[in-house]
């Protein structure tokens, strides 16, 4: 698939990332259409995915995405929580349209509802959980790219990228690799320069674990320094209220003394 070019071949660093993220570990069951991507079966029953074919299908999917003139016509979908953050990050760097969370039924087929969309290409995280958009895409002839495990059904899927889509690290790494390959084909980044965006941004983080990490980080912080408060001597203040009251009492005249008491009755006038 790489055409014999070394620059397009799978690098050792990428292989190491895939092995650490358990991208090569499939499930114990195998769909008959996924047998071509299985390297061998371990003694414990786990099927090993051929990472060479994974890389070839990843490059094919990236070329299909780049072939769409308007990037917003490419819809990336993930109903599973472990892939929602990766989908949002992928859409951010590739200018595609994300659908993270529940998919509204009829979004591709019912023209009456406000959520109606007309994408030209779909990229889904799991064919099992994202079966609704895949089914609707088949009604309106929309090609579908999917990250598939060894037990995933390939009905209505045009490009299957074999990988472990049940691991948060694996699915995050695959979305990161796909985004990097898309940007390389567009010419946004060079193949000789490492992409500065780290793969950790695509990993799903459990909210409870994140809260525990924040609490543990706060415990490791040193206690805040308490500044000593210096008591300054307070000057004695005069009670101005007493002085004002004394002056007021001393200066008041008895107005009753100057008042001329006139008896209207003595003058005989009424």
Swiss-Prot record:
GO molecular function terms noted in the UniProt entry: ribosome binding; structural constituent of ribosome
Function: Required for the assembly and/or stability of the 40S ribosomal subunit. Required for the processing of the 20S rRNA-precursor to mature 18S rRNA in a late step of the maturation of 40S ribosomal subunits. Required during oogenesis and imaginal development.
Record's subunit section: Component of the small ribosomal subunit. Mature ribosomes consist of a small (40S) and a large (60S) subunit. The 40S subunit contains about 33 different proteins and 1 molecule of RNA (18S). The 60S subunit contains about 49 different proteins and 3 molecules of RNA (28S, 5.8S and 5S). Interacts with oho23B/rpS21.
Source organism per UniProt: Drosophila persimilis
Subcellular location: Cytoplasm; Nucleus
Biological process, per Gene Ontology: ribosomal small subunit assembly; translation
Family per record: Belongs to the universal ribosomal protein uS2 family.
The organism's place on the tree of life at top rank: Eukaryota
Pfam families with a match to the protein in the record: 40S_SA_C, Ribosomal_S2
One Gene Ontology term, aspect cellular component: nucleus
PANTHER family membership: 40S RIBOSOMAL PROTEIN SA
SUPFAM superfamilies (UniProt xref): Ribosomal protein S2
Keywords: Cytoplasm, Developmental protein, Nucleus, Ribonucleoprotein, Ribosomal protein
HAMAP family (UniProt xref): Ribosomal_S2_euk (MF_03015)
Name of this chain's protein: Small ribosomal subunit protein uS2
